């Protein structure tokens, strides 16, 4: 297992290098000139040229890339073109709000989605199944921005129960986490149901019932562990999606997180921030998949990695 983990960690290097090259090319192909945006609409050509020189954008593309890579290898992600703060400080100040929002969204989405999926599988083709799958399809189909604005209108504007924007207290987390986790809960419900339906028809489940084991114990002890293996995979993918895909929700609720920072950086063509965030999201996905692989062996000891 240790050798497997070390090999996967070493595999991060070429993957992140490829991502760095692609994101560098992508941000420099974006339409618009960051120097013109920073200088302002009233700036003349001389001022814009001076800003480009200060930002290093007047140098050839390969020179800019080499400087970018060498700095990244030293842990230096550069300075924001807009705020003039180090990119690492910009990301650090926004990371925790996004992380806590992701965790709260993931907790309720996994618990609720798995409960719905297990109930739908146990009472297959009956009203719990139909109700649960109707809720799941609705959650997947409803756009996040529309759900967020609807919840905000009902619970913040009409009823006045919850705050609309900000991240100052636990109450601020309720509406964004519900919005962000709705699609994940729906996916988890459908995936858990599908996995449990397959497991419930296995021979060892019928054998356990024939021995007189209660249905609840059969489902929880024998069914849950075996059904969890594909579900854990989906949990890892969804966690990575939440951590890197909260852009729309953060924009709707004016959340001070990485998603909103990325949107603002793209609007202002803030190259260093865009590049650092995409690299961070890529690293998160890779590490989450590695954790999922390690969890396989914990859930089912029969699985071993060489």
Curated annotation (Swiss-Prot):
GO biological process: transmembrane transport
Its membrane topology: Multi-pass membrane protein
Compartments (UniProt record): Cell inner membrane
GO CC list: plasma membrane
Cytoplasmic side: 1-8, 124-134, 190-228, 300-306
UniProt keyword list: Cell inner membrane, Cell membrane, Membrane, Transmembrane, Transmembrane helix, Transport
Transmembrane segments: 9-29, 103-123, 135-155, 169-189, 229-249, 279-299
Domain called ABC transmembrane type-1: residue spans: 95-292
Key word Coiled coil present: no
Subunit structure as annotated in this protein's UniProt entry: The complex is composed of two ATP-binding proteins (GsiA), two transmembrane proteins (GsiC and GsiD) and a solute-binding protein (GsiB).
Family label: Belongs to the binding-protein-dependent transport system permease family.
Function: Part of the ABC transporter complex GsiABCD involved in glutathione import. Probably responsible for the translocation of the substrate across the membrane.
Protein name (Swiss-Prot/TrEMBL): Glutathione transport system permease protein GsiC
Taxonomic lineage of the native organism: Bacteria, Pseudomonadati, Pseudomonadota, Gammaproteobacteria, Enterobacterales
